[in-house]
Amino acid sequence: MKEEVKKYYGEILKKSVDLQTNACCTRDSYPKYIKDCIKNIHTEVVESYYGCGLVIPDCLEDCNVLDLGCGTGMDVYILSQLVGKNGKVTGIDMTHEQIGKAIKFQKYHNEKFGFENTTFIEGYI
């Protein structure tokens, strides 16, 4: 089963529109401050988002956050903006292709946000 999931997310899915499920919610329901964060994220990361919603508590500034199954990193990059320069966000994903895309755009987001506070790890949760 693990290999099937890796193949689906690593080889079959290329963009958000390729996702074959209705279990995930749309970004239309996100609050404005999250939508504003998404505007700062590279288009290629946003277009390859396969998440099932984002639950974010209040008061994240300066916190350390772990994103399990981070995929291409959109939630990590949203959280990066919310925790700020003194916080840290770590994303873990088992899919080489997904985590590779997250890392590919890490420098872009570091420069865009003005700080480096993200780490990506390829591994199992």
Predicted regions and their residues:
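N-terminal auxiliary segments of SAM/dcSAM-dependent transferases
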Residues: 1-27
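Charged/polar, solvent-exposed surface patches and flexible loops
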Residues: 7, 11, 36, 40, ...
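Class I SAM-dependent methyltransferase SAM/SAH-binding core
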Residues: 64-68, 72, 76-125
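Electropositive phosphate-/nucleotide-binding environments in soluble metabolic enzymes
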Residues: 3, 49, 53, 92, ...
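Mature extracytoplasmic/luminal segments of secretory-pathway proteins
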Residues: 21-22, 56, 67
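Disulfide-bonded cysteines in secreted/extracellular proteins and peptides
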Residues: 24-25, 52, 70
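Conserved alpha-helix/loop element of class I SAM-dependent methyltransferases that forms part
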Residues: 28-64, 78-82
